[in-house]
Amino acid sequence: MNAFAHAWYYISILRICQCVQGQKTFFVQGVDKSIFLVYDALVKAKASLSIKLLDAFAFFIFLADPKKPFHRMAVFRLSFFFLTHSFRFASSVKRRANLMRTVSDYFGCLVFDDRVMKARLNADIYQSLHKTIDQGAKLDAGVANAVAAAMKDWAVEHGATHYTHWFQPLTGITAEKHDSFISPAPDGGIIMDFSGKELIKGEPDASSFPSGGLRATFEARGYTAWDPTSYAFIKDRTLCIPTAFYSYGGEALDKKTPLLRSMEALNRQAMRILKLFGNEDVKCVRTSVGPEQEYFLVPKELYEKRKDLIYTGRTLFGAKPPKGQEMDDHYFGVVKPRVAAYMADLNEELWKLGILAKTEHNEVAPAQHELAPIYTTTNIATDHNQLTMEIMQKVAAKHGLVCLLHEKPFAGVNGSGKHNNWSIATDTGVNLLSPGETPYENAQFLLFLCAVIKAVDDYQDLLRISVATAGNDHRLGANEAPPAVVSIFLGDELQGILDAIENDTPYEAAKKKTMKLGVDVLPRFARDTTDRNRTSPFAFTGNKFEFRMLGSSNSIACANIMLNAAVAESLRIYADRLEGAEDFEEKLHEMIQKTIKDHKRIIFNGNGYDEAWIREATEVRGLCNYPTTPDCIPHSLDEKNVQMLTAHKVFTLAELKSRCEIQLENYCKTVVIEANTMIDMARKQILPAVESYTAELSGTVAAKRTVAPELACLYETGLIYKLSRLTDQIAVKTDDLEESLLELKSVSDITEEAYAIRDAVLGKMAALRTVADEAETLTAEKHWPFPTYGELLFGVR
């Protein structure tokens, strides 16, 4: 029994004594005060009071007058009450004590972070490790052993029994293999052991993960390598060590390795630029990201009745409910109690892991919500987002809910995305995308801004490729998310500055306006220099860019790899030109002006949902428009893309080819699973349900006409006719869909298979859904075989 249970044991005894019928003895007098003293002491001391002291305290209170057996009899008779309630009381005290804890008391308590390293490592080891983290210095074996020992001791103290090299293969989710700390001791017992070698290197099977041809089935050896820049953490009593994953031949088989390479590429080129501006104190440049995560919550008992949600993560059938998101009443609305409880538990779990969960609110669609963290270094933000998605689903299960991360779980309402807030900063704390008070005169900012503009224009196809999945295809361009055409929103102020530079005209800065709301008691504040454009795929938002095309289930690694690499290429070109310039300022102005003229086509400050913009973008401006995943993925191997990515050593050609194949395979497999699920549901659930209802209606008509032969039974016969027609159509369209899947088996090339799915399978899936959804609207509720949209979207109360 823990200290809380002990406390409530004695408090229960005091309460029992207090309940003795009206006896004003010393048992009653002062007992309430004693209870509160015990409780307050427990909270303040965090349950560290000596149990022996509590024993003595209770013994004195209970046995102070041994000549009164009546009181002992009362305790005996009420002992059953104590046994059944004391642990509930203990839990109650523990909950109250937890509420009294501040977040700072437990934030990062499951992370082997800098605070822990400083406390557990000697100064030399700590400094050496930081040299590796900050400057990329080689990790000495002695340092690795010391860190491993400290890490193991800390983890064991926190209840860990195993460790794992935690990595991000090309599946889109994380992977882990657990090994225990135990080693045999000479006396037949065990010792807890963890070496530096085990810390820095692991050997998982590389043939069982997607490799795009880099690994054959018989070529199983792969390696994981510790990423010391991302802190180790404890999850489910397992020490998780963030690692990179690569093959026996050295090819990257994960998403972390290319991400770290892209960050290093951008760092190299940005440092060249900063040196030209005289920033001698800067030692490195890092990109930072804050990903906003959208998701849906549905009741678990309803989720388990839908095969489509279980197999695919989205609904493949479902008629529109009477109410959706038309009233705009869910966005920022009051959070329902059950959801609020989920959010509170989620925050606590994330905070324990050092994840900076900051903002939470209802999103536009019913049952849709959002979680946003404070930004952090890109590779750490990527690790944190993968952890966040995993923990969101685990915490939801504890609350009887299921967290849906699919980009389009429900038709007819908004899907879920993930906004990637991206910026560049120096190790001295300078945000290189911050305009400052006078952006027109801030040449360094303007150069980095132009580098981003040039990068997005030159490699718009790579940005589209980085967010391409079967699920995200449902969102992009559907008037709920940015279009598939990539463009940049800058806002009025920056647009005015660029126009002035392009035309060599003076720039007149607009005066800052104060917001006047017409109510004296409300505060007045300066209006921002630009509005927000929620329809833009890539929007400047004051001191960062918000890349809004990512799907909610996407790893943010892919988008940031391409973005970092593309900007690194722009900075390389600028540095090459400026380093050899005779007149730095003149060359700088000329280069900024040329960038604006050459790449202004990518800038669009209007409504991205407007069809007229899509026509202008493609027909007039010549921007890329790749509506689907098969349209864009093959362009990852375009010559310009291969040249840039290999030149900066972000990918090798073999790695690029493998990723192209893996993305197409994932697309094909995803859609085929969805199509097979539709066939299964149509034949085993929908058709039998409609037939059952039709039979019931037929029986009703027969019964009525037995009693009154003259009855027309127009309602029943009309409905029977409609349902019979729909039954035939569902059966035919199910067969058509199955036939199209069989035809795919004869296609050997993965690109051709993806095209066939895009051109044939998706259309037949949509046709089957249309007739099935119509049948749902005509079938009695008791006959429909699975929960409806209305139940799913409004089931969490």
Name the predicted role of every residue range.
Residues 168, 186, 397, 427, ...:
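Hydrophobic alpha-helix feature that most strongly marks membrane-spanning transmembrane helices
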